[in-house]
Amino acid sequence: CYSTVDVVGLGDNTFTFGGVAGTVGGSVTRCFATGNVQAWMTVGGVAGMVGTRGGSLTDCVALNGAVSGTESRSQRISRVGNVLKSEGGSESGNYAWSGMKVNGNTVADDDVEGSNGADLTYDDPNGLSRQFETIFGGNSAWTYAENGLPTLKNVGGTQSGDLPVWMTSQNKVYIYTAADLAQLAADVNGGNKMSGKTVLLMNDIDLSAYANWTPIG
């Protein structure tokens, strides 16, 4: 399975939101998500929570541009999915794009069994790191193309194999949330060089949670 849509939980007390599933109570294997995910709490690029009634998430890839909470006190925000081990939840063989923003910041990790998964990289000379091909290449359910998204076989409609624009546009900065904008302000006002980069505002931004906002630049 896969999902390319953005997922947003509106208002307070919005729990367990993920790019593919909110709560995983069964077995989810070999899926990917590319849309951005935002909710109040318990947010993951692929699944919000893994573990209800012994759920498992295996060989999945999060290619989301950003996952985030709706406010500064939001908790359990992860690249792949939050694991409820007390209920028998488990994760294994999972990866996430290394450039994904988690509450406005990138998170480096190499744990394929953890909530953030292990880093999967993309660069123009080398393309996608080999883990993506290992998961989807040669599988009977998928048609795999080098350095592109796999598409499901025997499924109607139109499917796109294009990678998310944020993975291939290294000179663009995408602003989806207030946290993204705050990070941009910190980078620019802190002296980090932004020469040659294009900043794109992707959503309306509410800065009411940020008191004494300092203008950018």
Please name every model-derived segment.
Residues 1-217:
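Predominantly extracellular beta-rich ligand-binding scaffolds that present long acidic/polar faces
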